[in-house]
């Protein structure tokens, strides 16, 4: 059985089929065009450069294309890269199903739906419960398929739902420790805070930003969705405004993308839960590709740090 891309070590030779996740054009210092491609399989992704590309070659190597690539693994400024020696588009009789090359959440979709449904069932505030159920039902198919981001954390198929399920479990544990928290508000905030990403992002594979995503962003999108849902359900109550605020403020600061800082206790806690789960996902995945006694590659979204895996951790 062939190794997955995340299992290769620096210096090893690679000769595998991979999926182009993204392809970005650049101009080298010598004035010649090149492509930066992110190649992936179910274990993760890796960056590679294609130098001196012609317009014809550029048209070949686009997102969602399966390629056969040979080369070697190198460490460039703390980041693992694939140095390409040979590359070609795969033939139809070699590989056919793109889904075989994408990373997926480690939990089944039906299990995640069941858990989220149980959290909604536990809500006692009818306005919060109705709004949350309505919006989840409206976007459920995309919610269960989409990643939580294009990069950095939970950027895999069903990553959005997996992120929410993990956050709900965190919210429950924190609410049990601090009973003054409004569980209904916190659970609803967790479920709704990133739901706008089903409109912001293009889909589960080779994910990019939509026009709405670029011009509005998932926070503004979801604030509007909550308002529309309240109108449709004829809910005219303060819960609507508080839920909108929780979504609006969940990034914490204006420089991080939130027009308002958290001004409600549950909004503050949601911000920390979101941040904690995202960072844990980044660290766990980086450390999962690292041997005991060694450092991870640099994690850009965590201040470009390399994390050490203790030698006694298997």
From Swiss-Prot:
Its EC number is 3.1.-.-. One of its GO terms (biological process) is rRNA 3'-end processing. It holds the Pfam family HD. GO terms for molecular function: 3'-5'-RNA exonuclease activity; nucleic acid binding. Keywords: Exonuclease, Hydrolase, Nuclease. SMART domains: HDc. InterPro entries: 3'-5'_exoribonuclease_YhaM, HD/PDEase_dom, HD_domain, NA-bd_OB-fold, NA-bd_OB_tRNA, YhaM_exoribonuc/phosphodiest. Residues 163-279 form the HD domain. Belongs to the YhaM family. Shows a 3'-5' exoribonuclease activity. HAMAP family: 3_5_Exoribonuc_YhaM. This is 3'-5' exoribonuclease YhaM. The lineage of its organism: Bacteria, Bacillati, Bacillota, Bacilli, Bacillales. The gene is yhaM.
């Amino acid at each position: 059985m062939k190794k997955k891309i995340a299992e290769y070590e620096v210096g090893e030779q690679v000769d595998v089929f991979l999926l182009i996740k993204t392809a970005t054009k650049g101009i080298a210092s010598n004035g010649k065009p090149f492509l930066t491609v992110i190649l992936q399989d179910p274990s993760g992704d890796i960056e590679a450069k294609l130098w001196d590309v012609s317009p014809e070659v550029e048209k070949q190597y686009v997102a969602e294309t399966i390629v056969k690539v040979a080369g070697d693994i190198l460490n460039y400024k703390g980041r693992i890269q694939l140095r390409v020696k040979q590359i070609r588009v795969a033939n139809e009789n070699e590989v056919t199903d793109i889904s075989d090359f994408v990373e997926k959440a480690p939990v089944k979709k039906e299990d995640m739906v069941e858990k989220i449904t149980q959290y909604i069932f536990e809500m006692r505030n009818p306005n919060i419960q109705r709004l949350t159920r309505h919006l989840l039902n409206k976007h459920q198919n995309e919610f269960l398929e989409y990643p939580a981001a294009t990069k950095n954390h939970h950027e895999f198929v069903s990553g959005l739902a997996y992120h929410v399920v993990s956050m709900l479990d965190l919210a429950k544990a924190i609410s049990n420790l601090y009973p003054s928290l409004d569980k209904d508000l916190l659970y609803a905030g967790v479920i709704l805070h990133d739901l706008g990403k089903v409109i912001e992002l293009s889909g589960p594979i080779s994910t990019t930003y939509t026009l709405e995503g670029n011009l509005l962003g998932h926070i503004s999108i979801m604030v509007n969705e909550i308002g529309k849902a309240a109108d449709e359900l004829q809910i005219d109550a303060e819960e609507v405004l508080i839920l909108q605020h929780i979504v609006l403020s969940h990034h914490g600061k204006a420089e991080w993308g939130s027009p308002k800082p958290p001004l409600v206790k549950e909004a503050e806690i949601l911000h920390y839960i979101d941040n904690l789960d995202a960072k844990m996902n980044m660290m766990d995945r980086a450390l999962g590709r690292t041997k005991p006694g060694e450092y991870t590659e640099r994690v850009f979204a965590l201040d470009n740090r390399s994390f050490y895996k203790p030698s006694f951790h298997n």
